[in-house]
Structure formats: C-alpha cells, structure tokens
From Swiss-Prot:
Encoding gene (name): efp
Database matches in NCBIfam families: efp, PRK00529.1
Record's keyword terms, sorted: Cytoplasm, Elongation factor, Protein biosynthesis
GO BP: peptide biosynthetic process
Descriptive protein name: Elongation factor P
C-alpha cells in the first residue's frame, strides 16, 4: 500500500483492476476543509488518461512492476519470439501485445518488457533505432534546400516520412515514439 501523499510522477498504482501510472499530481491544501491530492493517471494497458482526486493520506494499492530485458530472435506464425538475456527462456508475444512498436522489430534487437503478476503490460523499444531504407522515390540533385518530405519504407516494413535527399539503401535513425526521421546514420 502507498499513501496518496507519497505519489510522484511515474508511480504505478492499482485501481479498479487496472494498473495506472501517475502522470501529474498536485497536493492541494484549501483554507477550509481537508487536504487532497489531484492526479492525472494513465492506464498502462490502454493508454487512457483520467483525472482522479484522492484524500490526503488515503492508502492505495501500489502496483509492483517487473522489467525484463529480452532480445527479439525470430517471428513464427504471427508471434514474435523473444529470449530472456539472463535465463535464456523464450517468450512469445503477439503483435497486439507489442503494440505499434512491432513494425520496428528487427532480429537481435533488445527490448524491455514490463510485467505485472506475470502478464505483459507493455513493450518498451529503444527510443531511436537505425534502419535501412528499402523503398522510396529517387532523390534529385538540389533537393536539400526545399525542406520537403517523402514516404520511405524501411527494412522492417515501417513507413516514415524522410527528407527528399534520402535514397534507397541509406541507413537512417528513426524515433520509435512518434515515427519521425532523426537523421542519417554513418
């Protein structure tokens, strides 16, 4: 159990059978009446954000999360197979469990898997990854100044908007949080 007075950004709690992460919190001490804690909570499973108010000192069940470092080894019949780097156990995850990050998974890539009571809650990919451009419109000389973008398909099948000067075969860095181009990789 954790007191609402001890809430911090990133604290995980259990409410109504779901795991929530505290995104924002504010301790309010009105001149009249009792103090309370106003929070903004994000569901770890669905990503929904709700606002909830707790009485000061109210006890809430703290969610104990485990973080496991896994390496993506291969894909078999629609499931992504990962290997635990310490125990060498295999774990199978569906693309629904991985979420939108499945389009960036490459063999040999290491990810962090967040577990709660043995159940996968979320898969954390590296913030930036380097991938090869496999398909895009050809770049034309002098396209660097206009600042335009074009779609490019990467080696994993993901589609990202890249500058006009990027051509097929180049290695680029991509931000996995918002699917954006970060730059060329040398």
């Amino acid at each position: 159990m954790i007191s609402s007075n001890d809430f911090r950004t990133g604290t995980t709690i259990e409410l109504d059978g779901q795991v929530w992460r505290v995104v924002e919190f504010l301790h309010v001490k009105p001149g009249k009446g009792s103090a309370f804690v106003r929070t903004k909570l994000k569901s770890v499973q669905s990503g929904n954000v709700v606002e909830k108010t707790f009485r000061a000192g109210e006890s809430v069940q703290q969610a104990i999360l485990e973080k496991s470092n896994l390496q993506h080894t291969y894909v078999e019949s629609g499931d992504y197979v990962f290997m635990d780097m310490t125990s060498f156990e295999e774990t199978r995850l569906s693309s629904e469990q991985i979420g939108k990050g499945s389009k960036y998974l490459k063999e040999g890539m290491e990810v962090n898997v967040i577990l709660h009571n043995g159940k996968v809650l979320e898969v954390e990919l590296p913030i930036s990854i380097t991938l090869k451009v496999t398909e895009t419109d050809p770049g034309v000389k002098g396209d660097t100044a206009s600042g335009g973008t074009k779609p490019a398909i990467l080696e994993t099948g993901a589609q990202v908007m890249v500058p006009l000067f990027i051509s097929v075969g180049e290695m680029i860095k991509v931000d996995t949080r918002n699917d954006s181009y970060l730059g060329r990789e040398n």
